[in-house]
Amino acid sequence: MSFNEQQCKQPCVPPPCLQKTQEQCQAKAEEVCLPPCQDPCQEKCPTKVQEVCVPQCQALSQDNCPQQSQDPCLPLCPDQCPSQCTEPCQELSQTKCVEVCPQKIQEKCLPPGKGK
């Protein structure tokens, strides 16, 4: 929980290599790179962050750091699904989050009585 809270408070700051190209994609980064946990279940957050941040910023800084440039822009889901998505397990939020982290959603959002 504390991990998610800290992420929410921290703005999306590009890595050093991306700061060189900040002027060219600052607007996009600010628009799209909002903390994923702020709107974890909305369309914008998980998928759009990958779409815009990776191609736009990574293309500009690919020579400097192809991998690092996409790391800060990826959502938290691969490691830890946002609690706001998994706790309610509503159809809507589940559908949105499944796109980003299907395994975690299945683990936490499985209907009771199945599996165990």
Curated annotation (Swiss-Prot):
Q: Which domain of life is it from?
A: Eukaryota
* InterPro entries xref list: PRR9
Query: What name goes with this protein?
Result: Proline-rich protein 9
- Organism whose genome encodes this protein: Bos taurus (Bovine)
Name of the gene encoding the protein in the UniProt record: PRR9
